[in-house]
């Protein structure tokens, strides 16, 4: 469930970017008698000038200065490499003390991680936003600690909607139902908009697009008990709507949804060719850079009920290397409000703590203004079931096959049933 700035995070230059900070060496102790904490973190920057290395370097230096018995060594890797590198380190018996990566469930299932209550102070643990903390639990115990987050909203091109008569000039737009959304898309089509509504169900991020529509249709990938409900009646009806009312009516443009990736949909939006699509904070920056006027609102629901946004998070975890006290103290420091907000402000992400949430919400900084609509949706957002070891495989099934559900001859019930069957087999449930 990565919050990449493709999704939230963009990897650096695409190559390995390894930097050791505050010293070198791979041991957990030193000849000076100090404890050495080895941290592996992902790079959220787009290149050397805004690499996450700077944040971690300063954090490690300040922490080491205030805690002379502990030295923190941080290795910063590109998103292309960091998950695989940590997995390799664990396999070789050289796991880092702390890793900030995209997923934790496999390590938790293997008994490799400390639970949060053996690491964090009560104050820090209580400060984590509830839906994010809950997503870090496996069988009731929290092993994944949220690091940064984002939510997904519906974007619209203001000029295109005004020109099509969907909204008056200078007015805002918030459709409440799918019927209103469909009516707007029809007006956009009649006015010559190439893609009234983009529906990227291609292999890049089909699971995200699917989950957003499922939630809006009253369903979801899992229920409140975290059991898979992929082939529920609500979800089948959602994909029947997408197939019949959007794709079948010619409202999703010339690209087949199953072959359209989010990246290309975003590019088309920033080129002024798309009226409406689901997106994340990075699209705000991309659209503004090309002079696109936009609005951002929750995706309307099938019946006008209160919408629930989809959330995405990246994770931090502590491996059982014999230093729970030292690892926990460093994590307490990492989660201090000033550190949380410094990182999220730099990369246009959302804080995962209540204190950071309030600080961003109350901020007068114009740079944070576009993020506040995403921020307000975060506390009630629904996240992927990342605590399930099966999720990686289920996500892959969505990417491979869900686009076929909305093809002209698509059978949503059958496609979702096949994905659900794969999920149940992976879970070992009937």
Residue ranges and their predicted role:
Residues 65-128, 144, 163-165, 267-268, ...:
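Extracytoplasmic "Venus flytrap"/periplasmic binding protein-like
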Residues 65, 249-250, 288-350:
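Extracytoplasmic/periplasmic substrate-recognition and gating elements
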Residues 102-153, 182, 209, 295-297:
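Hinge/lid segment of periplasmic solute-binding proteins
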Residues 118-128, 170-174, 196-201, 219-238, ...:
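Short, solvent-exposed loop/beta-turn-alpha elements that line the ligand-binding surface or hinge
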Residues 2-105, 303, 326, 342, ...:
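Conserved N-terminal structural module of periplasmic/extracytoplasmic solute-binding proteins
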Residues 349, 370-422:
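C-terminal capping/gating helix-and-loop segments adjacent to ligand/active sites or protein-protein/ligand interfaces
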Residues 143-147, 152, 179-231, 265, ...:
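Extracytoplasmic/periplasmic solute-binding protein
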Residues 185-187, 226-258:
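Glycine-centered hinge/linker elements that transmit conformational signals in sensory
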